[in-house]
Amino acid sequence: MAELKLRRSLLYVPGNMPSMLQNIPLFGCDAIQIDLEDAVPYSEKDAARILVRRFLEGYKNRNKEILVRINGLDTKWALDDLKAVLPALPDGIRLPKADSPEVVERLDTLLTEYEEEL
């Protein structure tokens, strides 16, 4: 089992804001959640995925836990979110609005399939 860490603070950062992504190393928090869901307008979702992936690939000194909040699995954006960010190995994926165990199981299946491809 993975070691559990106490998160005293979690900072939410919109995935479409390059200036905020660049400043993540400066924030004095335990964890960062980069949001690809509600914080990102529909017209900017594709660009936000690219920004988030590039940030994750370039952020080598991971002294903070980095989570990515994807769009809900019932949207047209969720699979693209996963395909974009999983290769950059975020510390975790946050699933919004999971209203049933089946939704969580579906995400588990998708993540397992991705891990098997590695």
What are these regions (language model features)?
Residues M1-L118:
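Expand to "…catalyze enediolate/carbanion chemistry for C-C bond making/breaking, isomerization
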